């Protein structure tokens, strides 16, 4: 019986690993494209609902809790737009890993109490380009009552994933964050209300 050369084993193993890496890359790109397409469909539905709001029974001071609209079994609180990176996405009312695969999610707070925190996957079609934002870039959050909230980026930082207090109680009106590609840290964007 003939001995297998260690060099041949290394070559075969290398090819297998390259194929696995290529497969993982293709899977991630497909998941990103699917999430982006699904989010754009929801944005169109949300915009239609905001343009044709149902009449309210009473008027008065705004409830600090954001109004929710259900689309395809998911609840949404609004739409986020970041022109500098070409983002226009729906925002789900509650955070969970399965929801993050569809759209950004509110994790804490409200635009009505100036402590809104929104998380999203680092898909290119979601928050994958947050690192390219700079101080002064504009961000808009429109809630389901059609109230437009204008923000301006104050700073962009990379934080430890356990920095929950720094995010939840940041003192900023809006905080956006996503994982870095390795998943060990979080790209975090702190925004103030626009003047």
PLM regions: where:
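Solvent-exposed, non-transmembrane regions of membrane-associated and secreted proteins
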Residues: 5-195
């Amino acid at each position: 019986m003939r001995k297998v050369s260690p060099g041949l084993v290394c070559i075969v193993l290398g090819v297998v690993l390259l194929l696995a890496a290529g497969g993982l890359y293709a899977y991630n790109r497909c998941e990103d494209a699917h999430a982006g397409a699904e989010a754009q469909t929801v944005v169109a539905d949300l915009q239609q609902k905001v343009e044709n709001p149902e009449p309210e029974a009473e008027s008065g001071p705004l409830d600090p809790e954001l109004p929710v609209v259900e689309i395809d079994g998911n609840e949404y609180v609004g739409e986020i737009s970041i022109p500098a990176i070409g983002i226009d996405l729906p925002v789900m009312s509650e955070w969970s890993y399965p929801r993050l695969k569809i759209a950004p999610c509110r994790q804490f707070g409200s635009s009505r109490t100036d402590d809104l925190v929104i998380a999203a996957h680092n898909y290119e079609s979601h928050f994958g380009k947050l690192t390219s934002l700079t101080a002064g870039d504009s961000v808009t959050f429109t809630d389901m009552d059609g109230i437009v909230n204008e923000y301006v980026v104050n700073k962009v930082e990379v934080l430890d994933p356990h920095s929950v207090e720094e995010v939840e109680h940041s003192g900023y009106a809006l905080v956006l964050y996503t994982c870095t590609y390795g998943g060990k840290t979080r790209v975090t964007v702190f925004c103030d209300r626009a003047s």
